[in-house]
Curated annotation (Swiss-Prot):
Stretch list, region 6 X 2 AA tandem repeats of N-G: 91-100
Source taxon at top rank: Eukaryota
Sequence repeats: 91-92, 93-94, 95-96, 97-98, 99-100, 101-102
Name the UniProt record assigns to this protein: N16.3 matrix protein
Length: 131
């Protein structure tokens, strides 16, 4: 009995680690592919026209999403999710040399500028552009 319990606990711990460590993944829903970022963890996000990045916030009203995000109901199979999704204009008008204007997302959160290639790297924003 003790041995079984020990194996059960080990399995649950490993399962938990794998669950928490999973990367953002893409899910096709309707017209868009959604890139899901689990547990509201800050990581790089991108939007290449048909991908929108969402936090699994389970918001129940539009006001729970941040200013630069859009509240969406998303149906996948039999389940409904309520998500906060980044809007299409997050990257702004990147000019290729790291000085995209970033529009609402980068400006409001970091007071900095996008890197112009469609990705957000918080480290660069904090160290290089936030001046």
């Amino acid at each position: 009995m003790k041995c079984t319990l020990r194996w059960t606990i080990t399995a649950l711990v490993l399962l938990g680690i794998c669950h928490l460590a999973r990367p953002a993944y893409h899910k096709k829903c309707g017209r868009y592919s959604y890139c899901w970022i689990p547990y509201d963890i800050e990581r790089d996000r991108y939007d290449n026209g048909d991908k929108k990045c969402c936090f699994c916030r389970y918001a129940w009203s539009p006001w729970q999403c941040n200013e630069e995000e859009r509240y969406e109901w998303l149906r996948c199979g039999m389940r409904f999710y309520s998500l906060c999704c980044y809007t299409d204009d997050d990257n702004g008008n990147g000019n290729g040399n790291g000085n995209g204007n970033g529009l609402n997302y980068l400006k409001s959160l970091y007071g900095g500028y996008g890197n112009g290639n469609g990705e957000f790297w918080e480290e660069y924003i904090d160290e290089r552009y936030d001046n």
